Design a protein with these regions (language model features):
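Active-site-adjacent structural elements that line small-molecule/cofactor binding pockets in enzymes
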Residues: 1-344
């Protein structure tokens, strides 16, 4: 099992606890991950962290594909990977219609098609075997639209080839997981109860079979929040707030992938109730409606001994090959030390 830490989204003011990251690096954590939504970006913090660390890998979880061309992302990845001596990891996501069309001002389109095209183009750029040409639904290289000049020509990156860069995608739907298995090196399934790995693995393996690979060549990397404390309800509340936001409000009523995912995990009634409350403006009630069982299944909360006991289940999931990494969200130094002590 590899361990990573989540740097998380910045609020109104971006901040990075570099001492926490350096401490994790010294404990043996393998990676740290930055994020973006519609405020601070994921790349700038990643570059900053890479400049202030020596061994730990730094990835994006995630960069929104509709916000950048594949060539832009490939150039960014190759640049950071060179400057950091091979420590950068690309994490991509399709985002959702509300952000893509509301923030980036482009059509949401076909997310699975976009993912396949995007990664195909990036890998061509990384390989630098020939000038890049691609004509697909989302991307045209060289551009062949009627509003173009017709002067574009196929190009190769000026940087040296680098096929070592790993690409992860964020996915929780069956099609998204299958696509990730087909074209990516790993997946962020946001939260994942280790006992219910089969909900995801079947779709991933379908994709892996299309690319002639097996699960041992692929990394399933769920996000796991760790909160140590004697008061279970107090530990659960911030996690419930986050889960209520995603299950209830991260998307329209009829197109919320996180709501669908909660249903697939067996929490259909709760998912419906959370969304109804959240979209009615009753956010506190939506938070309270998140089942304790869902929090406990996906995250690590409570006294130290309770967390240690629960970590045994994660170890079993790792041994079975269903989970390759745990990406830890923890503000407590003690929590990072606890997980490292048990898992590394």
């Amino acid at each position: 099992m590899k361990l990573g830490i989540l740097n998380g989204l910045g609020g109104k003011n971006i901040s990075i606890d570099i001492n926490r990251i350096k401490a994790a690096e010294s404990m043996g954590y393998d990676s740290v991950w930055t994020a973006e939504a519609y405020g601070s970006d994921a790349v700038t913090p990643a570059a900053w962290i890479l400049a202030h660390t020596e061994k730990i890998k730094v990835g994006t979880a995630i960069m929104q594909m509709p916000g950048r061309s594949p060539a832009c992302t490939a150039s960014t990845a190759m640049t950071l990977n060179q400057l950091s001596n091979g420590r950068f990891i690309v994490g991509l996501g399709a985002s959702g219609p509300q952000v893509v069309e509301g923030w980036h001002g482009v059509a949401y389109g076909r997310p699975m098609t976009r993912t396949k095209e995007y990664i195909e183009i990036m890998r061509k750029i990384f390989a630098r075997e020939e000038p890049v040409e691609h004509q697909g639904f989302h991307y045209s290289m060289p551009y062949q639209g009627e509003d173009g000049t017709g002067l574009g020509k196929p190009l190769k990156s000026m940087l040296a080839a680098d096929t070592s860069i790993k690409i992860y995608t964020a996915a929780i739907t069956p099609r998204g997981l299958e696509t990730s298995g087909e074209v990516a090196d790993g997946v962020f399934p946001i939260w994942m109860p280790p006992e219910k790995g089969d909900v995801l693995i079947e779709s991933i393996q379908t994709g892996l079979s299309k690319s002639g690979r097996s699960l041992v060549e692929y990394d399933v990397a769920p996000f796991v929040t760790v909160m140590i404390g004697d008061n279970l309800e107090h530990c659960r509340m911030p996690i419930k707030g986050n889960m209520a936001l995603y299950i209830g409000g991260m998307g329209a009523r009829n197109k919320n992938f996180y709501n669908d995912y909660a249903k697939a995990l067996g929490y259909e009634d709760a998912a419906i109730k959370i969304q109804d409350l959240f979209l009615s403006g009753k956010k506190d009630e939506a938070m309270a409606a998140v089942p304790d069982e869902l929090v406990d299944a996906c995250h690590l909360v409570g006294p130290v001994e309770r967390i240690k006991e629960r970590l045994q289940v994660w170890k079993e999931a790792s041994s079975s090959g269903k989970i390759g990494s745990m990406l830890i969200g923890a503000g407590q130094q003690e929590a990072l030390e606890l997980v490292a002590g048990e898992m590394l």
